[in-house]
Amino acid sequence: MNIAIIKYNAGNTKSVEHALHRLGIQPVITDDAEQIQQADKVIFPGVGHAEATMQHLIELKLDKVIKELKQPVLGICLGQQLMCSHSEEGNTDCLDIFPIMVKKFETADLQYKIPQIGWNNLTDLKSPLFNKINEQSFVYFVHSYYCENSEYSIATC
């Protein structure tokens, strides 16, 4: 299996690579359009600011490459958010792969501090990605923004 991790100065690229190595998978980390297009699967990681990151993707000409991919793409953190239509972070137009808005948590409505940092339970699992993960499993989050729940959602927390 040929897995490409999109290289664009995302903060969690090495963590994703390390996780795949633990599974016996040797991914390629690349910003080369051809390598990304030829991969069986693509991982789009990310930690950062939506506006600055979108600008960087445009400069690298990866915005069009990502939008045109036909193989499975796993967006992680900001990578997932950038596949949506628009982010409130920097009032940023994103890749518009999914017609979803990325919104900032409203602090008045929450009993938590923002950014939300900590362990949450996964619920409503709707993807084969979670076949070996139990409902109510704990996962760690660090975020101030979220993708609206929609028909494209594969889990909630």
Role assignments for model-derived ranges:
Residues M1-A4:
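Extreme N-terminal starter segment of soluble prokaryotic enzymes
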Residues G11:
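Conserved Rossmann-like nucleotide-cofactor binding loop
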Residues P27-Q38:
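Short acidic low-complexity segments
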Residues G48-I117:
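Cysteine-nucleophile active-site neighborhood
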Residues E68, M101-C157:
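Amide-donor transfer/coupling interface in amidating biosynthetic enzymes
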